[in-house]
Amino acid sequence: MRSMLAISAIVAAVFAVPASATVIDLSTLNRAGSAQLVDGALQLTHTSKVSNASGVSGAGWLTQGVSTTSSFSTSFSFSLKGDDSGKMADGIALAFQNVGTNVTGVGGGDVGYWNIGGSGSSAVGSVIRSWTHNEYGLSTNGKVQGLDAAPFNLGASNNVTGSQTVSYNAVTHELSMSGIFTDLSTGLSYNVSDTATVDLSAKFGSTMYVGFTGGTAGTDADQRITSFSLTSAVPEPETYAMLLAGLGMIGFTARRRQAQK
């Protein structure tokens, strides 16, 4: 009985380990396309004041893969700012993919999210689109169409900030997003949320790359990621090792006591 209580105590201790959040230095992201580091932020696109009908896209990726078999959560903040000469465009995305870290997708309204590295519908993530689209939400197939209507006209605002937290449950395969958008032209803030089901392990294998994309075309915007963190919701490998060692010691002690009776 005492052995079982000890085992229960060890297991409880393992799963009481708090999640470990890692704040990502944006300068360490691998940048592709139009992306650059500006004032400590990841600037995905900028206001060039030059029309580019074929589209421009930029991206920034963690250089190390993230496990798809463990639950996790990632949070980021962003700013989208036009040059006040019309509706800003076109938007950004938090993206998961397994193509590589020197890639981006189609620019313009596809916000660098569709066809990442020529891989078509491979991406999963959270998309925000401005200009006349004005929508947001989770996408599990690389597409940016058919999302939820934004709570205000992002494109016409020309000045939007916000934050999102996107979490993945590796057991239920539920992807969830919650966040807030602030219209700096009015000072009003709005809550946003979405959920989707996707098996990241089946889609990407054991690891994937996490990062951001952004795109512009005929109309542009200064689109930046201003903060980024990743939280592991599972115990570290060392904790599992401690669990196994503890269970082994308890088993050995129990067997020894039985042999002495």
Model region roles, listed by residue range:
Residues 22-232:
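Polar, low-complexity loop segments and adjacent catalytic/binding residues used for recognizing
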